[in-house]
Structures are given as C-alpha cells and as structure tokens.
From Swiss-Prot:
Stretches assigned to coiled coil: none
Family classification: Belongs to the Dps family.
Pfam families according to UniProt: Ferritin
Name of the featured protein: Uncharacterized protein in bpoA2 5'region
InterPro entries: DPS_DNA-bd, DPS_DNA-bd_CS, Ferritin-like, Ferritin-like_SF, Ferritin_DPS_dom
MF (Gene Ontology): ferric iron binding; oxidoreductase activity, acting on metal ions
Length: 150
C-alpha cells in the first residue's frame, strides 16, 4: 500500500445519463424517468441562462453599464442556486443530472446568442426571451409530472 495519490484514473460509468436507479420513494420508474428527463431539460436551460447572464454581464456597455453589470451578476448567481437545486432533485429521483456544459448546450431550448457583443436592448430582450422559454417549459413539465404523482 502506498500513500501516493492515484492520478489519471478513468473508470467506466456507473450509471448512464437518461437512466434512473430503483429507489424506495413510492414513485414509479416511469414517473421518475419522465421527471428526470424534464428536470434535466430545465437544468440545461438554467445552466445556459447562467452563462447568458455572465456573457451580458461581461459585455455591458453604455451609461447604464454599471447598474446592469451588477444586476446581471446577481441574476447569474441566482441561476447557479437553481442549477444546484435542480441537479440535486434529479439525483434524488435516481437519475443523472446533466453536468457537462457541452451536453447542456445540446439539450437546452434556449437559443444560442451570437459570439460577439450585442447592444443593451438586444441583451435584455434575449434574457427575457430565455426566461419566457424556460417558464413555458417548466409550467408544462410541472403539469405533466404532477399527473404522474411527482
């Protein structure tokens, strides 16, 4: 036995994304599967919204730059708190939370912004549209998973 750390280890996945383990939580496998699927979509959207807030935060220009810079940073932090709560809920249901930003970018419903800097009005509009997209999906998901008992 050695006290040296075991570096550069890579093991096989112990649970694939999109699967749920059986847990004694009085909720059917199908209900947990569907809930995890919908929650992962919301999680990906929220991760993407966090990144969008930071992009706007860093790219702020003009006379309201300072105030919006602070506001966007506050909202970005709130998104991070939601990301953690959503991911933990997926795990609680026996699922695997989407944790890789590349994976989140593939499953998000929030449109990708341009790579450059937009004007302030476009940034605000893009953020509002992203929130509306997420809210519509969350409302639909909540209704459907409630119908399954979750």
């Amino acid at each position: 036995m050695t006290s040296q750390p075991h570096l550069h280890q890579h093991a096989a996945e112990i649970q694939e994304f999109g699967t749920v383990t059986q847990l004694p939580i009085a909720l059917s496998h199908d209900a947990r599967q569907y809930s995890c699927q919908r929650l992962n979509r919301v999680l990906a959207d929220t991760q993407f919204l966090y990144a969008l807030y930071k992009k706007c935060h860093w790219g702020m220009r003009g006379p309201t730059a300072y105030q919006l810079h602070l506001l966007f940073d506050k909202h970005a932090q709130e998104q991070l708190e939601l990301v953690d709560a959503l991911a933990e809920r997926v795990q609680t249901l026996g699922g695997v939370a989407v944790g890789d930003p590349r994976h989140a970018a593939r499953i998000t419903g929030v449109p990708r912004p341009p790579d450059g800097i937009e004007d302030v009005h476009s940034m605000l509009s893009r953020l509002l549209d992203a929130h509306e997209t997420i809210l519509a999906d969350v409302r639909d998901a909540a209704t459907r998973v409630a119908g399954l008992g979750d």
